[in-house]
């Protein structure tokens, strides 16, 4: 079970709303979100309803302003509680679409895809175990995408506008 609290103002001030499960539309509960406190669980928050738009990964901790979660604005309109995973993590990445071309396998976090695999683009991937966060830049920066187990035959399947991938991180409550 997870628990996340959204606050309209910075530093956990103003009107607040608490969630313990997925919420496809947060608009009725607050008009803007400038701080968040995650008491338990791992969450994806989204700038638009129905888990659309820019997405941001949050784990247990305090985020006193939206820059702390690498947000671009104070617009948060939906959230998703990522189910906990208590096993191994495994993903295959491919340099071409349709799971073709050079393949590399990951079982742990990757701070820089370019340094580790000599790739700046990943065109398809197969998440075999666990959920992962894909970041468009190295060092877990830039746009973020939640990857659940399954095949992603092209970058559009995970919602990206291009195949640029900088880093990958396992979804875990604590690092």
Curated annotation (Swiss-Prot):
Q: What PROSITE patterns does the entry give?
A: CRYSTALLIN_BETA_GAMMA (PS50915)
Any Pfam family hit? Crystall
| Record-level Gene Ontology MF annotations | structural constituent of eye lens
Alphabetically sorted, this entry's keywords are: Eye lens protein, Repeat
UniProt free text on domains: Has a two-domain beta-structure, folded into four very similar Greek key motifs.
Q: Provide the protein name.
A: Gamma-crystallin B
Family annotation (InterPro entries): Beta/Gamma-Crystallin, Beta/gamma_crystallin, G_crystallin-like
In which domain of life is the source organism classified? Answer: Eukaryota
Which family is it part of?
Belongs to the beta/gamma-crystallin family.
Per the UniProt entry, what is one GO biological process? lens development in camera-type eye
Q: How does it assemble?
A: Monomer.
Q: Tell me the segments the record calls region Connecting peptide.
A: 84-88
Its biological purpose is as follows: Crystallins are the dominant structural components of the vertebrate eye lens.
* Domain Beta/gamma crystallin 'Greek key', first and last residues per copy: 2-40, 41-83, 89-129, 130-172
The cysteines joined by S-S bonds are none
Does Cell division appear among the keywords?
no
